[in-house]
Amino acid sequence: MTTPVIYDISIGKHKPHSGTQTSCPFCHRETLTDILDEKGDIIWLMNKYPVFRNTYPTVIIESAVHETDLTEYTKEKARQVISFGLEKWNLLERDPRFRSVIYFRNYGPESGGSQRH
């Protein structure tokens, strides 16, 4: 039997949005909580506002540089980010607690994310 992934729309009411804050929470490393791993300026942490119920939602902050994207990275930085993400994906894939793992990038105003970094 499969278990559906349930999107909890009520979480969106509590999430801070980029347009309503004076500073980016991802730019202040010292205030981040629930950090799972770090490599250089790449950080893997628990999502503070998980919109999918009964999941293990994490976030990867790819760079300390605000408002940059994969297309702007050097080849080496892009390799580091992709390798780090795949390493974490594989780690969760091997974990017997999970039946499946979804890895997606959520960036830009059309992505549905509430924080731009």
Regions found by a protein language model. Give the residues of each.
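Active-site microenvironments that recognize anionic phosphate/pyrophosphate groups
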Residues: 1-116
